[in-house]
Amino acid sequence: MLKRYMLLAVATVFFAFQVLTSTATAAELDDATRTVALNEGSTVTLSTQQAKEGQRLFNFACANCHIGGDTKTNPSINLSSASLAGANPRRDNVEGLVDYMNNPTTYDGFDTISEVHPSTQSTDVFPLMRNLSDEDLFDIAGHILIQPSVIGDQWGGGKANR
Protein backbone atom coordinates (compact mmCIF):
# COMPACT_ATOMS: atom_id res chain seq x y z
CA MET A 1 0.00 0.00 0.00
CA LEU A 2 2.84 2.38 0.86
CA LYS A 3 4.47 1.61 -2.47
CA ARG A 4 1.28 2.63 -4.29
CA TYR A 5 1.15 5.97 -2.44
CA MET A 6 4.81 6.63 -3.20
CA LEU A 7 4.23 6.00 -6.91
CA LEU A 8 1.20 8.28 -6.84
CA ALA A 9 3.24 11.03 -5.14
CA VAL A 10 6.07 10.71 -7.69
CA ALA A 11 3.60 10.78 -10.58
CA THR A 12 1.89 13.86 -9.12
CA VAL A 13 5.19 15.72 -8.77
CA PHE A 14 6.20 14.71 -12.30
CA PHE A 15 2.94 15.92 -13.88
CA ALA A 16 2.94 19.12 -11.81
CA PHE A 17 6.43 19.88 -13.09
CA GLN A 18 5.26 19.32 -16.68
CA VAL A 19 2.35 21.72 -16.22
CA LEU A 20 4.46 24.43 -14.59
CA THR A 21 7.21 24.41 -17.21
CA SER A 22 6.92 24.99 -20.93
CA THR A 23 8.99 25.46 -24.02
CA ALA A 24 10.00 28.91 -25.24
CA THR A 25 7.03 30.83 -26.54
CA ALA A 26 6.73 34.01 -28.54
CA ALA A 27 5.96 35.91 -25.33
CA GLU A 28 9.42 35.01 -24.04
CA LEU A 29 11.26 36.37 -27.08
CA ASP A 30 12.79 39.77 -26.43
CA ASP A 31 12.55 42.73 -28.81
CA ALA A 32 16.03 42.12 -30.23
CA THR A 33 15.12 38.55 -31.17
CA ARG A 34 11.82 39.65 -32.73
CA THR A 35 13.53 42.36 -34.81
CA VAL A 36 14.09 41.22 -38.39
CA ALA A 37 14.90 42.82 -41.73
CA LEU A 38 11.84 44.31 -43.41
CA ASN A 39 13.70 44.97 -46.66
CA GLU A 40 17.31 45.62 -47.60
CA GLY A 41 17.39 48.90 -45.67
CA SER A 42 14.90 48.70 -42.79
CA THR A 43 14.02 46.48 -39.86
CA VAL A 44 10.75 45.71 -38.15
CA THR A 45 10.04 44.36 -34.67
CA LEU A 46 7.30 41.76 -34.71
CA SER A 47 4.79 41.79 -31.89
CA THR A 48 4.61 38.71 -29.71
CA GLN A 49 1.24 37.96 -31.31
CA GLN A 50 2.76 38.14 -34.82
CA ALA A 51 5.58 35.81 -33.78
CA LYS A 52 3.15 33.34 -32.24
CA GLU A 53 0.81 33.48 -35.23
CA GLY A 54 3.73 33.14 -37.65
CA GLN A 55 4.82 29.95 -35.90
CA ARG A 56 1.29 28.55 -35.98
CA LEU A 57 0.81 29.37 -39.67
CA PHE A 58 4.26 28.03 -40.60
CA ASN A 59 3.45 24.76 -38.85
CA PHE A 60 0.08 24.67 -40.65
CA ALA A 61 1.12 25.54 -44.20
CA CYS A 62 4.90 25.11 -44.53
CA ALA A 63 6.29 22.60 -42.04
CA ASN A 64 5.27 19.57 -44.09
CA CYS A 65 8.19 20.31 -46.42
CA HIS A 66 10.26 22.77 -44.37
CA ILE A 67 10.49 21.10 -40.96
CA GLY A 68 13.33 22.65 -38.98
CA GLY A 69 14.11 25.04 -41.84
CA ASP A 70 15.21 22.26 -44.19
CA THR A 71 13.62 21.51 -47.56
CA LYS A 72 12.51 17.91 -48.05
CA THR A 73 12.29 18.14 -51.83
CA ASN A 74 15.65 19.90 -52.30
CA PRO A 75 17.99 19.55 -49.29
CA SER A 76 20.66 21.76 -50.89
CA ILE A 77 18.37 24.81 -50.53
CA ASN A 78 17.02 25.50 -47.06
CA LEU A 79 15.66 28.37 -44.98
CA SER A 80 18.94 29.26 -43.26
CA SER A 81 20.03 32.89 -43.26
CA ALA A 82 22.87 32.14 -45.69
CA SER A 83 20.59 30.37 -48.18
CA LEU A 84 17.99 33.13 -48.06
CA ALA A 85 20.67 35.81 -48.54
CA GLY A 86 22.15 33.92 -51.51
CA ALA A 87 18.89 33.77 -53.44
CA ASN A 88 18.28 36.18 -56.30
CA PRO A 89 16.43 38.32 -55.42
CA ARG A 90 17.44 38.13 -51.77
CA ARG A 91 14.93 36.40 -49.52
CA ASP A 92 16.54 37.27 -46.17
CA ASN A 93 13.94 39.91 -45.35
CA VAL A 94 10.19 39.97 -44.78
CA GLU A 95 9.30 41.64 -48.08
CA GLY A 96 11.47 39.19 -50.03
CA LEU A 97 9.87 36.15 -48.38
CA VAL A 98 6.34 37.50 -48.83
CA ASP A 99 7.13 38.11 -52.50
CA TYR A 100 8.40 34.53 -52.76
CA MET A 101 5.25 33.12 -51.13
CA ASN A 102 3.20 35.08 -53.67
CA ASN A 103 5.46 34.49 -56.71
CA PRO A 104 7.96 31.67 -56.13
CA THR A 105 10.97 31.53 -58.44
CA THR A 106 14.04 29.37 -58.80
CA TYR A 107 17.02 30.17 -56.58
CA ASP A 108 18.56 32.28 -59.36
CA GLY A 109 15.27 34.13 -59.88
CA PHE A 110 14.96 33.33 -63.59
CA ASP A 111 12.02 30.92 -63.69
CA THR A 112 8.69 30.85 -61.90
CA ILE A 113 7.95 27.67 -59.95
CA SER A 114 4.40 28.34 -58.74
CA GLU A 115 3.27 25.04 -60.29
CA VAL A 116 5.54 23.00 -58.03
CA HIS A 117 5.96 25.19 -54.93
CA PRO A 118 3.05 26.30 -52.73
CA SER A 119 2.10 29.91 -53.29
CA THR A 120 -0.92 32.16 -53.34
CA GLN A 121 -0.96 31.66 -57.14
CA SER A 122 -1.39 27.90 -56.91
CA THR A 123 -4.12 27.50 -54.33
CA ASP A 124 -5.93 24.95 -56.50
CA VAL A 125 -2.93 22.61 -56.19
CA PHE A 126 -1.85 23.69 -52.68
CA PRO A 127 -5.09 24.42 -50.79
CA LEU A 128 -3.30 25.25 -47.53
CA MET A 129 -2.26 28.55 -49.13
CA ARG A 130 -5.85 29.39 -50.09
CA ASN A 131 -6.90 31.48 -47.10
CA LEU A 132 -3.58 33.12 -46.21
CA SER A 133 -3.70 36.92 -46.26
CA ASP A 134 -0.76 39.26 -46.76
CA GLU A 135 -0.68 39.72 -42.98
CA ASP A 136 -0.45 35.95 -42.56
CA LEU A 137 2.42 35.80 -45.06
CA PHE A 138 4.13 38.64 -43.16
CA ASP A 139 3.85 36.65 -39.91
CA ILE A 140 5.17 33.46 -41.56
CA ALA A 141 8.12 35.39 -43.01
CA GLY A 142 8.82 36.86 -39.58
CA HIS A 143 8.80 33.39 -38.03
CA ILE A 144 11.26 32.11 -40.64
CA LEU A 145 13.63 35.03 -40.02
CA ILE A 146 13.41 34.77 -36.21
CA GLN A 147 14.38 31.09 -36.09
CA PRO A 148 18.16 31.48 -36.64
CA SER A 149 18.22 33.72 -33.54
CA VAL A 150 16.16 31.26 -31.52
CA ILE A 151 17.66 27.88 -32.43
CA GLY A 152 20.87 28.90 -34.20
CA ASP A 153 22.54 26.61 -36.72
CA GLN A 154 19.90 23.94 -36.23
CA TRP A 155 17.52 26.03 -38.36
CA GLY A 156 18.13 24.91 -41.92
CA GLY A 157 21.29 23.10 -40.90
CA GLY A 158 20.18 19.61 -41.79
CA LYS A 159 20.60 16.46 -39.75
CA ALA A 160 24.26 17.22 -39.03
CA ASN A 161 23.32 20.18 -36.80
CA ARG A 162 20.56 18.51 -34.79
UniProtKB/Swiss-Prot annotation:
Bilayer topology term: Peripheral membrane protein
A Pfam family matched in the record: Cytochrom_C550
Binding site residues for heme c: C62, C65, H66, H117
Coarse class of the protein's main subcellular location: membrane
Alphabetical keyword list: Electron transport, Heme, Iron, Membrane, Metal-binding, Photosynthesis, Photosystem II, Signal, Thylakoid, Transport
Signal peptide (from-to): 1-26
Cellular component per GO, a single term: plasma membrane-derived thylakoid membrane
Cofactor binding: number and manner: Binds 1 heme c group covalently per subunit.
Alphabetical list of InterPro entries matching this protein: Cyt_c-like_dom (IPR009056), Cyt_c-like_dom_sf (IPR036909), Cytochrom_C550 (IPR029490), PsbV_cyt_c550 (IPR017851), PsbV_cyt_c550-like (IPR016003)
Swiss-Prot/TrEMBL cofactor(s): heme c
One GO molecular-function entry: heme binding
GO annotation (BP), single: photosynthesis, light reaction
Cell location: Cellular thylakoid membrane
Assembly notes: PSII is composed of 1 copy each of membrane proteins PsbA, PsbB, PsbC, PsbD, PsbE, PsbF, PsbH, PsbI, PsbJ, PsbK, PsbL, PsbM, PsbT, PsbX, PsbY, PsbZ, Psb30/Ycf12, peripheral proteins PsbO, CyanoQ (PsbQ), PsbU, PsbV and a large number of cofactors. It forms dimeric complexes.
Function (record text): One of the extrinsic, lumenal subunits of photosystem II (PSII). PSII is a light-driven water plastoquinone oxidoreductase, using light energy to abstract electrons from H(2)O, generating a proton gradient subsequently used for ATP formation. The extrinsic proteins stabilize the structure of photosystem II oxygen-evolving complex (OEC), the ion environment of oxygen evolution and protect the OEC against heat-induced inactivation. Low-potential cytochrome c that plays a role in the OEC of PSII.
Family as reported in the entry's similarity comment: Belongs to the cytochrome c family. PsbV subfamily.
Name this polypeptide is given: Photosystem II extrinsic protein V
Lineage: Bacteria, Bacillati, Cyanobacteriota, Cyanophyceae, Acaryochloridales
Gene that produces this protein: psbV
